[in-house]
Regions:
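Metal- or metallocofactor-binding catalytic centers and their adjacent structured scaffolds
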Residues: 1-91, 402, 406-409
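C-terminal (or distal) subdomains of carbohydrate-active enzymes
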Residues: 65-69, 76, 80-471
Length: 471
């Protein structure tokens, strides 16, 4: 569902950009309308939460495949149309940013090059298996930037890595982190803040498995008693260093979770505070709940949760009956726990269940109900969640942008030298001068009369903002 929503938004943005630049591209209104209709159909109240019959999900998976394939074609056609007109004096990469924020982000593109620059300055990059991975800096909002290829620079590791009793101690420009052999974080020193994030004796990225047997309505309900029935996870685990390049330091974890097998890539970046946990799991359980827990040394009685076009604060205690009933709550891209001056967010790209209590951020990863579908959620799953320690609260800490960045990777296209191109090397279709105003949607009006922009104020504060339109 999340992937379809963002694919629709990206396709709309790309198509609107290509047509508005008078490239000869025609906005595919009918196809986009169909993609949104199918997305909304699959948000029916039994399909979306996983409480429908198994046969329903056979159709649903097929329809999601149609949505994603159609959006990919639209996006690819639109961006290739634009990229072919960007004026360049040598080969390189045009990176498109579909978000309403300017950003620095990691991109990967298949090409034969081994180096890349920005205004003559070499960018951190890494080559592997015919692909170039680099940090695209200063990407304009709702636009693109061209990065020319260059000769390879020596690849300097971004982290100092030391083996430590089956795990690793990793020093990056931002963090000093200790991982045990299960991929859990036993210590995290934030160098800029000068503080330890993980409480002594506890572990972050702790995978927790609970018994999950509701009194009734197996796929619908989660009972609060589940917390009293936790299973020990003592399966084999193996942690190795997969990459230590100028772009990132990546650990590779293979671990048994009861009868299931988990593979996880844990990635730290020198340019970003985000720590990613890209997860693949072959799920073979019944009547259990899997969560990822992140205890943090942060004192706050309220947590902030991302919702549609905003966020909402909820208590982290159970002093009232209604707070006690919120032992599990819904959120979209992130949940954040902050005290004055510092905080931590737990981001995701497609999980919706959170609980934040007693200084622990937890994200529900998978369940294993057997009614009405006896095979619900069995098989392969791929998702990413991320920890984002930050200065300030969720507003000053860039949590909103980080949530969008995780869910909407930038889009790179390799191009040849195009000296006859008519479009600039860097371009922003729309820009906003207020960090709390989010431009989420750019689409063609349903009657074809112009473009529609959907913006929202994200901090809950009065704001005066200027929207810069294209020339």
């Amino acid at each position: 569902n999340r992937a379809a929503e963002f694919a629709n938004l990206t396709a709309e943005t790309a198509a609107a950009l290509a047509e508005s630049l008078r490239t000869g591209y025609a906005y595919p209104a009918a196809a986009l309308h169909r993609n949104w209709e199918l997305t909304l159909l699959n948000q029916f109240h039994d399909i979306l939460p996983g409480s429908a019959l198994g046969e329903v999900y056979e159709v649903s998976q097929q329809q999601y495949g149609e949505i994603l394939a159609s959006d990919a074609r639209i996006t690819d056609d639109a961006l290739h149309t634009v990229a072919a007109l960007v004026k360049t004096d040598r080969p390189g990469v045009v990176v498109f940013n579909q978000l309403g924020f300017a950003r620095d982000t990691v991109v990967r593109v298949a090409c034969g090059a081994s180096g890349i620059t920005d205004d003559g300055h070499p960018l951190p990059c890494h080559t592997e298996n015919g692909a170039l991975t680099f940090v695209a800096k200063d990407l304009p909002a709702k636009g693109w930037r061209f990065y020319p290829f260059a000769d390879a620079e020596p690849e300097t590791p971004c982290a100092e890595v030391t083996e430590n009793d089956g795990g690793y101690i990793i020093d990056t420009p931002l963090y000093h982190i200790v991982f045990n052999g299960c991929g859990e974080i036993t210590a995290l020193l934030d160098k800029e803040a000068g503080r330890e994030l993980i409480p002594a004796g506890q572990c972050a990225n702790e995978l927790q498995l609970f018994e999950d047997r509701p009194d009734e309505y197996d796929a619908w309900n989660l009972e609060k008693y589940y917390r009293r029935h936790r299973f020990a996870l003592d399966g084999a685990a193996r942690l190795t260093v997969a990459e230590n390049s100028p772009v990132c330091c990546r650990l590779h974890l293979e671990r048994a979770i009861s009868r299931s097998q988990l593979v996880q890539d844990i990635t730290l970046y020198p340019h970003s505070r985000r720590i990613d946990f890209a997860t693949h799991i072959d799920w073979r359980e019944q009547h259990v709940l899997l969560k990822a827990a992140f205890p943090v040394d942060i004192c706050a009685d309220r947590a902030q949760y991302d919702i549609q076009f905003g966020s909402i604060a909820r208590d982290t205690h159970t002093n009232t009956s209604w707070d006690e009933a919120r032992f599990e709550v819904c959120a979209h891209k992130w949940a954040d726990l902050s005290e004055p001056g510092y905080g931590a967010a737990l981001l995701n790209d497609g999980r919706y269940g959170y609980d934040v209590h007693d200084g622990v951020l937890r994200l529900s990863l998978l369940r294993a109900a057997t009614y009405p579908d006896p095979h619900a959620d069995q098989g392969a799953h791929d998702f990413t969640y991320a920890l984002l320690p930050h200065l300030g609260d969720w507003r000053q800490g860039g949590v909103i942008l980080a949530g969008y960045d995780l869910n909407a990777p930038a889009l790179p296209l390799a191009v040849a030298a195009q000296p006859a191109g008519t479009l600039p090397a860097a371009y922003s279709q729309f820009r906003i001068d207020a960090p709390n105003v989010v431009l989420e949607t750019v689409k063609k009006a349903e009657d074809g009369s112009g473009l529609i922009l959907r913006l929202y104020e994200s901090w809950g504060t009065r704001t005066r903002a200027a929207l810069a339109l294209p020339d």
